[in-house]
Amino acid sequence: MKFLYMLFAAIPALAVNITTFTVIGCGGTTHIFPCDGLCHASSNMRAFKVDAGAEHCVTVYSGNACQSGTLQFPTPNSEGECEPIEASQATLSFLCSVDNTCAT
């Protein structure tokens, strides 16, 4: 039993990532970030994809440091698919939660 516990403890949890794009159709410059519930800077983010098979919620902000003007994208709207951001303002930061709970 002790061996099985050590074996499962050694298997890392699968990391879920978000890929951001500078073009609405998921083109242009890309950056990859972890879906870790932390605020990430991403100037000119116009679309994103989150790894398939993972619950999440992406909250996009028009201000720096995840402040002001939010758009929310919960699962399953964008699971593994290109999600365009139709925003009138530039998107400067975002938060990708580790589950489907959106930031407020």
Where are these regions (language model features)?
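Compact beta-sheet-dominated domain cores in extracellular/mature segments
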Residues: 3-104
